[in-house]
From Swiss-Prot:
This is Putative nickel-responsive regulator. Binds 1 nickel ion per subunit. Disulfide bonds: none annotated. PANTHER family: NICKEL-RESPONSIVE REGULATOR, NICKEL-RESPONSIVE REGULATOR-RELATED. Keywords: DNA-binding, Metal-binding, Nickel, Transcription, Transcription regulation. Ni(2+) binds at residues 77, 88, 90, 96. InterPro entries: Acetolactate_synth/TF_NikR_C (IPR027271), ACT-like_dom_sf (IPR045865), Arc_rbn_hlx_hlx (IPR013321), CopG (IPR002145), CopG/NikR_regulator (IPR050192), Ni_resp_reg_NikR (IPR022988), Ribbon_hlx_hlx (IPR010985), TF_NikR_Ni-bd_C (IPR014864). Its cofactor is Ni(2+). GO terms for molecular function: DNA binding; DNA-binding transcription factor activity; nickel cation binding. GO terms for biological process: response to nickel cation. Pfam families: NikR_C, RHH_1.
Length: 141
């Protein structure tokens, strides 16, 4: 197996070590491998390809030390055909939370999430997607 080096804040490394211990992992490498597989597989679900999806993306960043807010606005404008709605909230003393409601196909949503994740100074990105046609069967009854 190839050995790699990864840079991360000490606080994140501490959390990673605690997580590994609490959940019975043999070490941080096992946690990072599993997380990497999960991240890479997120948008590779063949059941979602070619289907119209709705998605929610939640982004958290420190508004005092980053230009992330400006970048979020730029990404939103670049994907205005996919972004149905966007809410910006102040959370705590230093943080902003952006909530994006998306509608589109898998490749459009994954491109949007990828650009958000690639933005420097982002503290957290979370999302979920649901196929719109999942509700058609419920409405037919």
């Amino acid at each position: 197996m190839t050995v790699v080096s990864v840079s991360m804040p000490e606080s994140l490394l501490d959390r990673l070590d605690e997580f590994a211990e609490e959940h019975g992992y043999t070490g941080r490498s096992e946690v990072v491998r599993e997380a990497s597989r999960n991240l890479l597989g997120e948008f590779e679900d063949k059941k979602l390809e070619g289907r119209e999806l709705m998605g929610v993306v939640t982004v958290v960043f420190d508004h005092e030390t980053s230009s992330a807010e400006e970048r979020m606005m730029q990404i939103r404008h670049d994907h205005e055909h996919t972004v149905v709605s966007n809410v910006h909230n102040h959370v705590g003393d230093h943080y902003c939370m952006e909530l994006f409601i998306l509608e589109g196909e898998l490749d459009e949503i994954s491109t949007f999430v990828g650009k958000v994740r690639a933005t420097s100074d982002i503290l957290s990105v979370d999302y979920s997607v649901v196929p719109l046609d999942d509700f058609e069967a419920d409405l037919a009854h």
